[in-house]
Amino acid sequence: AGHVAMIAGPDLVTSLVEPDEFLAYVSGDLGRRFVAGDADLAARLAAMDRRPDPDGRFRVTEFFCRDDTWQATVQRLVGESDAVLMDLRSFSAANQGCVYELGRLLDTIDLARVVLVIDGTTDRGFLEATLTRLWAQLAPDSPNRQAAAPAARFCEVSGPTAAESRALVGHLIAA
């Protein structure tokens, strides 16, 4: 168990609004929630609360990013992570915005510590072809160089059920 960092773009900010984000929006302060550059990212990482709350739960730290900050944020968070959960629902040739992140994962963290969430909208053939292509371009210092081929840990979901939640947590614990 440990702290959770989540990267989100403007689309997620507008689709899933939490109470504190709504208050920031109403007060005109929502823009300050977005990572403003390298110095701001470093400050946010340094200030991240990594300790559990008194009830034992860990907080989720959200890193809202725009086009000019998300790649640096991905790189820094992946480099500091013990495990990574990546949502690849709807991933396809027409919706392949996560290719950069997949490449950074393969180059930076042991793939055994990564859980890829997929569902019926994920083009699994395209995903496997993408992983194979990225595998052929691994960085020389990638921790995955020792493996012969990518062995990704997939967690297929179909809806918000207790059984799927337990399975997802099980995958994360194993990672």
Language model segments and positions:
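N-terminal targeting/trafficking signals and adjacent low-complexity tails
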Residues: 1-20, 25, 75, 126-127, ...
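Extended, compositionally biased accessory segments flanking or bridging domains
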Residues: 1-57, 64
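Short beta-alpha junction loops
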Residues: 8-15, 90, 108, 117-126
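An anion/phosphate-binding loop that grips the pyrophosphate of nucleotide cofactors and donors
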Residues: 80-81
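Short hydrophobic alpha-helical runs that function as membrane-insertion/retention elements
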Residues: 85-86, 112-118
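Conserved TIR/SEFIR loop-to-helix hotspot centered on a Trp-containing motif
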Residues: 90-104
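Short, surface-exposed basic-aromatic patches at helix termini and helix-loop junctions that form
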Residues: 102-111, 136
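C-terminal interaction surface of TIR/SEFIR-family domains
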Residues: 124-175
